[in-house]
């Protein structure tokens, strides 16, 4: 064993860490299922990141609405480091305090009663879908299994969640898709009403369609969905993966309409970059997921949960989310000023709430995004013609300018 380990070459010692070499190495070894710009990010602090060559970028996408407190937030770093020094992982066959504390924080903050932890938004949405099936069986109505979701929605990349997603481009090549999903126009309450049938079990909705172009439903849409679900005995499931954790200026997007969903999915900003997701639900629904019905080896991992506890504590501080609303209003105003200065129609729409803003152009955004990368700004597309801005909440007004 000793001789073998001594004879093994040191990959790190012999590797070329230049940008070009790393990009070529990535192309040799990684699946080529992402389109990435030709630079390698190396470190971050606050709302800024630096690449391997030392070039600085203002991060206006925050890991796709994930690094809500910016990069290397000192309180989150301290929480994760302290947990690394005590306990990394035990799986969910044992209790761990960070997970218990996080469940208590999230249920109190959301108004829901039970938490299940996983590792991503897709897994959280899978949990919602499985919960729906199990609840309907426990109610004695197993024939009710269909979920209504919406055109242009996005709920994840697993086979079930990509089927729930209302965008054919993400489903292409993965047919046959699982049965049990119906898509209707977003914001059209009458279309939802017509789609409800004997097999309908739930409605799955995003308060704002982030990946669908930062599309906002008419005010009152969620209220209407809640009433429709109550009328027909359906579950109202709200995907808060992108809109939750304060992104819209309230703890969760559904709170803008004053409703209480049956279940929600949370991820992205929950761990500020560490992988963690959660499904939160009402007490009576959570009773359906008994031991053995669902699980996750890594879900609610002590280190990720410790970081998430720090995130939630910070977000819950008095006045913190008020600042998110103020900065969001400022970003929207500045984007609309730019819209007014450019030739008519160049910017077709500016949409958003809080620090989730979409700027829709009259042409494809890919060349524009490549250009702003060169200028030291990180943004992302939300559809072919919309640029998504989801900066860290700690971004300053000066940085937004």
Curated annotation (Swiss-Prot):
GO terms for molecular function: identical protein binding; N2-acetyl-L-ornithine:2-oxoglutarate 5-aminotransferase activity; pyridoxal phosphate binding. Its EC number is 2.6.1.11. Keywords: Amino-acid biosynthesis, Aminotransferase, Arginine biosynthesis, Cytoplasm, Pyridoxal phosphate, Transferase. N(2)-acetyl-L-ornithine binds at residues 157, 296. It comes from the Bacteria. Its cofactor is pyridoxal 5'-phosphate. Binds 1 pyridoxal phosphate per subunit. It is found in: Cytoplasm. Gene3D superfamilies: Aspartate Aminotransferase, domain 1, Type I PLP-dependent aspartate aminotransferase-like (Major domain). GO terms for cellular component: cytoplasm. It catalyses: N(2)-acetyl-L-ornithine + 2-oxoglutarate = N-acetyl-L-glutamate 5-semialdehyde + L-glutamate. The modification N6-(pyridoxal phosphate)lysine is found at residue 268. Pyridoxal 5'-phosphate binds at residues 121-122, 154, 239-242, 297. Belongs to the class-III pyridoxal-phosphate-dependent aminotransferase family. ArgD subfamily. May also have succinyldiaminopimelate aminotransferase activity, thus carrying out the corresponding step in lysine biosynthesis. This is Acetylornithine aminotransferase.
């Amino acid at each position: 064993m000793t001789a073998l380990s001594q004879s093994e070459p040191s990959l790190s010692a012999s590797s070329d860490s230049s940008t070009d070499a790393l990009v070529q190495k990535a192309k040799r070894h990684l699946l080529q299922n992402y389109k990435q710009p030709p630079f390698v990010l190396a470190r971050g602090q606050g709302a800024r990141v630096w690449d391997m060559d030392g070039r600085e970028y203002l991060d206006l996408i925050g890991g796709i609405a994930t690094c809500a407190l910016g990069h290397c937030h000192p309180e989150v770093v301290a929480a994760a480091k302290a947990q690394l020094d005590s306990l990394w992982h035990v799986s969910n066959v044992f209790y761990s305090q960070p997970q218990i504390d996080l469940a208590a924080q999230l249920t109190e903050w959301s108004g829901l009663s039970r938490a299940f932890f996983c590792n991503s938004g897709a897994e959280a949405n899978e949990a919602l879908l499985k919960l729906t099936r199990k609840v309907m069986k426990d109610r004695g109505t197993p024939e009710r299994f269909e979920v209504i979701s919406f055109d242009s929605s996005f709920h994840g990349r697993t086979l079930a969640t990509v089927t729930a997603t209302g965008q054919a481009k993400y489903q292409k090549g993965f047919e046959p898709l699982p049965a049990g999903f119906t898509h209707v126009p977003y914001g059209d309450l009458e279309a939802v009403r017509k789609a409800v049938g004997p097999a309908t079990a739930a409605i799955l909705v995003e308060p704002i369609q982030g990946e669908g172009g930062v599309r906002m439903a008419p005010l009152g849409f969620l209220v209407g969905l809640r009433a429709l679900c109550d009328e027909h005995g359906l579950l109202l499931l709200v995907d808060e993966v992108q809109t939750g954790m304060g992104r819209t200026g309230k703890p969760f997007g559904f709170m803008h309409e004053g409703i209480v969903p049956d279940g929600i999915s949370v991820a992205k900003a929950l761990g500020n970059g560490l992988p963690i997701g959660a499904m939160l639900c009402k007490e009576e629904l959570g009773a359906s997921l008994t031991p053995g019905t669902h699980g996750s080896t890594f879900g609610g991992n002590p280190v990720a949960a410790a970081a998430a506890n720090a995130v939630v504590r910070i977000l819950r501080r008095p006045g913190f989310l008020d600042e998110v609303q103020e900065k969001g209003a400022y970003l929207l105003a500045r984007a609309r000023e730019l819209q007014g200065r450019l030739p008519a129609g160049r910017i077709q729409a500016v949409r958003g709430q809080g620090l989730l803003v979409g700027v829709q152009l009259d042409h494809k955004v890919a060349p524009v995004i490549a250009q702003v990368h060169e200028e030291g700004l990180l943004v992302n597309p939300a559809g072919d013609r919309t640029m998504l801005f989801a900066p860290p909440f700690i971004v300053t007004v000066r940085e937004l300018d």
